[in-house]
């Protein structure tokens, strides 16, 4: 029987927001701040919300306008308090307003008559990557790279089994030691979970730690094994709080009367076959997790590779684009996709394009076609979707860019304005340098194009992505130059300082 292992899961608390607070010499736990690109309009997603602002029921991935609206609601209540305490100021128009505001939670709690304000910090992705790297190096002072798995920019899994006897520490003590050093070096607070497998470590961090008191620095560390998991979480709701249990899965479970992990565990004792009928091979994972089991360890997750691969480009446009300008964006995205395939030495069998139309097409009253509902319950035209398959796998720009443009023309309604574009390269495989040829194929021309792509890629890698651009990228509405300066679709920003940002009242 294999020896029981001990895993840590560590999550940096509101990471992007915390970095912005620390760089401004502000307390990440008490400063009201959101990370969002306000220049993209209030529909932009908040990449992070500070803990104190979350306490006003603003979710971590809200749209900026949702945060704005919630703050207005809070301030409406606070203004009534200020009026009752005779601390509000009456303007010339006879309306009351706050005498002062604050973005600090402690100050706001001390004086309920103050208005709630907050900082909107533009994202600086390069800075976040730099801080994440610094924190990763802190972990490496205690464990080997072989025993740590970066799950995301702000979250890691660590197998600490062999280190506990070495350091003469418990898992809790080792976790606290690492988290304290991260806090000392960066000013960023972390939450940790300890488990007898990766799944339980993740749940200890995501669910259990959120319901225990924090220490004076805001640090929370929780532990789970199979027994305590069943005791603490078998009746926990909603099921979407559990790792790898999404809304679609939960909906199907609930249709069979399964509302908790305890329900699922009990159902599996007599209805296992039915679970496999519903979920296929994924039923095995669901059943294991219901009982608190997770067979995969550090070696397995590090060696995992998806069985099928695709590469995608997507963007939400800052405003509604007319059809001709949207086509320009599709060509730019296809070019980016081509360079990504070239750099990775991959080819694709087909591309899929999805076009999301703007709601103004319906709001204006002239649209009579098929519709769908967006996440906010608004009626919008039904998205356009299509795929084109190539004669042979390719990464040549002449094929990918031109075929993407033709596909756009074929599937879109030219009268409608566009807001979302997603382009996927499907079934990508290693480029073996083989062409499907016939009597009319100019193989020398194909080789020349491939060498040109590689040369352009070399220039971009050395001098920056904007070193070589097509003239079309300078046309009005083009986004490639801006996107080339981004990381993950968001501004790379500066590397330090954090002086930019707007105070919102």
Locate the predicted segments by residue.
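A generic structural signal for short beta-strands and their flanking turns/coil linkers
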Residues: 29-31, 349, 384-386, 419-421, ...
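C-terminal hydrophobic structural anchor segments
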Residues: 405-461
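Short conserved micro-motifs at the rims of enzyme active sites and ligand-binding pockets
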Residues: 363-367, 433-437, 481
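Short, hydrophobic beta-strand segments
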Residues: 156-162, 384-391, 435-441
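Core structural elements
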Residues: 153-156, 347-362, 424-432
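Gly/Gly-Pro- and Ser/Thr-rich, intrinsically disordered tail segments characteristic of DNA damage-repair
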Residues: 1-288, 295-298, 443-505
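A short glycine-rich, hydrophobically flanked beta-strand micro-motif that places a catalytic Asp/Glu
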Residues: 190-194, 349-353, 419-421
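DNA-contacting surface of Y-family translesion DNA polymerases
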Residues: 2, 9, 241, 247-417
């Amino acid at each position: 029987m294999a020896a029981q292992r001990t895993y840590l899961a560590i999550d940096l608390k509101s990471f992007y927001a915390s970095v912005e607070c620390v760089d401004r010499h502000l307390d990440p736990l008490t400063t009201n701040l959101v990370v969002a690109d306000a220049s993209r309009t209030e529909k932009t997603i908040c990449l992070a919300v500070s803990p104190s602002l979350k306490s006003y029921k603003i979710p971590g991935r809200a749209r900026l306008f949702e945060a704005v609206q919630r703050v207005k609601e809070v301030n409406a209540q606070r203004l009534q308090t200020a009026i009752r305490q005779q601390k509000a100021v009456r303007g010339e128009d006879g309306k009351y307003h706050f005498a002062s505001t604050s973005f600090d939670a402690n100050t706001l709690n001390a004086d309920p008559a103050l208005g709630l304000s907050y900082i909107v910090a533009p994202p600086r992705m390069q800075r976040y990557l730099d801080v994440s790297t610094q924190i990763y190096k802190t972990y490496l002072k205690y464990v080997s790279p072989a025993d740590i798995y970066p799950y995301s920019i702000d979250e890691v899994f660590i197998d600490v089994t062999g280190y506990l006897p070495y350091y003469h520490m418990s898992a809790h003590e080792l976790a606290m030691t690492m988290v304290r050093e991260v806090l000392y070096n960066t000013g960023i607070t972390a939450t940790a979970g300890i488990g007898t497998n990766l799944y339980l470590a993740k749940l200890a961090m995501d669910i259990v730690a959120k319901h225990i008191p924090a220490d004076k620095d805001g640090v929370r560390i929780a532990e789970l094994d199979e027994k305590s998991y069943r005791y603490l979480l078998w009746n926990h709701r909603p099921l979407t709080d559990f790792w790898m249990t999404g809304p679609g899965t939960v909906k199907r479970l609930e249709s069979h009367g399964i509302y908790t992990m305890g329900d699922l565990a009990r159902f599996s004792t007599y209805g296992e076959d039915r679970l496999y009928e519903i979920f296929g091979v994924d039923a095995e994972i669901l059943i294991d997790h219901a009982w608190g089991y997770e067979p995969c360890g550090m070696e397995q997750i590090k060696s995992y590779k998806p069985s099928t691969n695709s590469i995608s480009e997507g963007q939400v446009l800052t405003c509604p684009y007319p059809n001709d300008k949207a086509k320009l964006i599709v060509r730019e995205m296809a070019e980016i996709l081509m360079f990504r395939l070239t750099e990775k030495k991959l080819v694709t069998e087909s591309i899929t394009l999805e076009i999301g139309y703007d709601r103004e097409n319906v709001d204006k009253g002239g649209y009579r076609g098929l519709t769908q509902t967006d996440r906010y319950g608004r009626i919008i035209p039904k998205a356009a979707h299509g795929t084109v398959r190539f004669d042979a796998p390719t990464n040549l720009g002449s094929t990918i860019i031109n075929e993407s443009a033709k596909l756009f023309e074929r599937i879109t309604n030219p009268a409608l304005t566009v807001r979302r574009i997603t382009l996927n390269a499907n079934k990508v495989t290693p480029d073996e340098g083989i062409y499907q040829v016939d009597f009319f194929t100019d193989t020398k021309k194909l080789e020349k194009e491939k060498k040109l792509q590689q040369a352009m890629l070399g220039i971009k890698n050395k001098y920056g992505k904007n070193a070589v651009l097509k003239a079309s990228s300078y046309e009005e509405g083009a986004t490639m130059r801006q996107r080339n300066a981004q990381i993950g679709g968001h501004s790379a920003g500066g590397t330090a300082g954090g002086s930019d940002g707007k105070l919102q009242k």
